[in-house]
Every structure is written in C-alpha cells, then in structure tokens.
Amino acid sequence: MMNPFLSYLTTHADDMLNDLKALVEHQSPTEDKALVDACGAFLCDLFARHLNVQPERFAQTKAGDHLLFKIGQGNRRTLLLTHFDTVWDLDRLGTRIEDGK
C-alpha cells in the first residue's frame, strides 16, 4: 500500500505543477510595487484555495505589501519566512517544462 502522503502528491502532481508554473509567471521585480502586489494576490488565492486561510496584510508604500499567514493552532508553531519579489527585470525570466520537469 502506498504511503498516503506520497499518494496525495502523485495524484495532485499536475495541479501542483500548474500552480507552481503560474506562480513563476507572476513576475515580481523588487522595484515594481504593483507587480509584487499582484504576485502577492496570487499567493493569497493559492492559500485560500488550498489551505482555507486569509493573510494579515501589512501595507507598504514603496515595496510590495507584506503578508502574514497563520495556519493551525496550538502551542508549538513553525515560522516560515520568505519573500516573493524577484531580482529579475520585467520579461527577463523565462519558464519552460521539458520532459515533465
């Protein structure tokens, strides 16, 4: 019998790849607040669809807004800190899938 986690990943691989591809295609150059915020909105949609959670938004004037997602409850917490702006200028980052990768 296949591990339930591995089974889930195998069953949903195409959906996850499509979400990842869509995220990469949301260009978010650091200096372009509007594009970074659009990428943030896409992330908010992903979190809402897959985890049923909405972020706390910390509006910024020059850079993209900061987002805080709280998932789960309890005394033991894990912090995942990341950014979603990119160092690439607009239209400089290409994506491709070859042989399913």
Give residue spans per PLM region.
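Acidic/His- and Gly-rich active-site-bordering loop/insert found
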Residues: 2-101
